[in-house]
Amino acid sequence: MALPEFAHSLYQSFERESIPLLLAGGWAVCHHGYTRYTNDIDWVCSRADEARAIELMKSLGFDIVFEAMATRFRHSRYFDLLPVDLLWVSVESFARMAQSNQRTGPRADISVIDLETLLAMKLNALKDHEEREGKDVLDIRFLMRENQGVITEDRLKQLCERFAGPDAYKFVLMIP
């Protein structure tokens, strides 16, 4: 599944303004081997760049739909464009995430979070959002299957305990 063209243009606009982004969410899931439908485009962005990123999105015709740990945008004129979520993380977290060597796009120029970070984000989402449970658990299971040997079982257990709690490992792997 190919990333929509407007996502490439958006990434380039951010690059021109020296605001780094990392592709996350469903498109990162697809990049890491599990192709599935996604109804938005998630980017990780440093909180240090939040004000500039919001101003850039507004200058490109996007309106804020809601703000929390992420800011969701919709284009004010082109309603067929997918919503865009900017997920805000600390400067330190962004620096760690940006060490990923994963790239996507026709010119392989779009930075993507690495598999371990993606799993950590999916596990963290499980902790607080029951309505997301099914989708995120499936993502984790399929990502582990598609990337056998990349993340060890012990490392997955550690990630589960750290980001989703002590029972998450059994839940994710359907262990009674």
PLM-predicted stretches and their roles:
Residues M1-P176:
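Compositionally biased terminal segments of proteins
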